Amino acid sequence: MKKSHTAMTTLKHYLQFTDLTADEYTYLFERAALIKKKFKAYEKHHPLVDRTLAMIFEKASTRTRVSFEAGMYQLGGSVVHLTTGDSQLGRAEPIEDSAKVISRMTDLVMIRTYEQAKIERFAANSRVPVINGLTNEYHPCQILADIFTFIEHRGSIQGKTVAWVGDGNNMANTWLQAASLLGFKVHVSTPRGYEVDEKLAAGAGGISADSYQFFSNPLEACRGADLVTTDVWTSMGYEAENEERRVAFADWCVDAEMMAAAQPDALFMHCLPAHRGEEVEADVIDGPQSVVWDEAENRMHVQKALMEYLLLGRIA
């Protein structure tokens, strides 16, 4: 029986987590599970034949590049890869002009850059969907993968508690958006001076008061959590603060005591790359509660579902 799909009638971008609805996420998670199952069974799945993804990197990446590039090829499409060395994004050419040109030659654009404002400007002038591969403010594709990984291992995340330990960065911002949208709670613990910017985290969709709680003690943030997650102490672009951050974050290392305070079946996640002995101890990230390798692989599967959806809509 031939499959049918409902093509997008309006252009849709994925620039932050609030760009999709809870219903759309339910569809994406179900679709990602099916696409992953096909991948594991070596079944071809080529809905994007003759489609081209442009990837623009102003921030270097391993997982983002491999997951998007391999994913697009697995969907039957092709990829154009641009870096700061071979693109003129926002330098010799205005971002608006680059967007108008690139979107006439490709079907989909993924951008990994510094300022959220830059990707917003690009999307406003693009004729094709634009995906946020990471900005200083948000990392929606990673949280998409993290939630999918939780669902794979523990079922629905609705009503659960996620403990965020560390920097109040783009990951923390996006977790807050996701919690408000999908109905779970986030316990956030950061050192003083590195708190989550609540106004930034609110973005377009806002955060609800009952989805967020701040803890000055990271151990208390982990108490009763169903998922404990963290990130590097020093994100890309903040290298000059590295030594200062090592001192400030010394007590924000996820260890066995924090995991013991969480639920007995709590999971540990990290978006990688990880620095063992800094934001997480080796016995945690390499231990039985860690699902970081599934989490990393799932970036590819959820992004395949996302690209398929942005171009083809829902497939029956």
Per-region residue spans from a language model:
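Phosphate/diphosphate ligand-binding glycine-rich loop within oxidoreductases
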Residues: 42, 46-151, 276
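Glycine-rich phosphate/diphosphate-binding loop of Rossmann-like nucleotide-binding domains
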Residues: 58-70, 152-230
